[in-house]
Amino acid sequence: MKFSPLVDELIQSLKCLPGVGPKSAQRMAFQLLERDRKAGQSLASALSSAMSDVGHCQACRTFTEETLCPICASHKRGNSEVICVVETPADVLAIEAGGHFSGRYFVLLGHLSPLDGVGPEELGLSLLEAHLASGEVSELILATNPTVEGDATAHFIADMAKGHQVSVSRIAHGVPVGGELEYVDSTTLALSFNGRLPL
């Protein structure tokens, strides 16, 4: 059954979200139209504002409405000479939620993927290299995802950093806290054994 053009357009637009198929998009559209038009209007307003006003931080490339994000603009960050390299702005939020890192970030907005046309320029690596060349960075922590592409990206950045007298490390990978060994994949187990620590 076909709906009105505006309802169809709303359903099609909602399908652009990750993990949202036709049925989920239809349920969301009907929820907003049938039960919560005020929330729908609020969503439309917030989405419109974000699409027009949110850009990328000129220093770290995370999302912000300003020239610099709050982290890069802060003079209270303890380890401003330490940069943690992540793939997405969501990774910044995850690390910040842990509260164990007080340095700055550099957001790649992806990972190296030559088959998809994503090379060093698309990841902003020339900006990262400019940070390293400034002499203000003492350590680079690579927190890319533990995937083939994430590993390749980390190795590329580590090689790039070699000429700048910067300490480079990679976050540890292994068995998650609260995880049970029988459910852990073999690659993660291998990383856990290779990265074991003395007690």
Curated annotation (Swiss-Prot):
A zinc finger (C4-type) spans 57-72. The keyword Metal-binding applies. It comes from the Bacteria. InterPro entries: DNA_Rcmb_RecR, Rcmb_RecR, Rcmb_RecR_Znf, TOPRIM_dom, TOPRIM_RecR. Pfam families: RecR_C, RecR_HhH, RecR_ZnF, Toprim_4. The keyword GTP-binding does not apply. Keywords: DNA damage, DNA recombination, DNA repair, Metal-binding, Zinc, Zinc-finger. CDD domains: TOPRIM_recR. Transmembrane segments: none annotated. GO terms for molecular function: DNA binding; zinc ion binding. HAMAP family: RecR. Belongs to the RecR family. May play a role in DNA repair. It seems to be involved in an RecBC-independent recombinational process of DNA repair. It may act with RecF and RecO. This is Recombination protein RecR. The lineage of its organism: Bacteria, Pseudomonadati, Pseudomonadota, Gammaproteobacteria, Alteromonadales. The gene is recR.
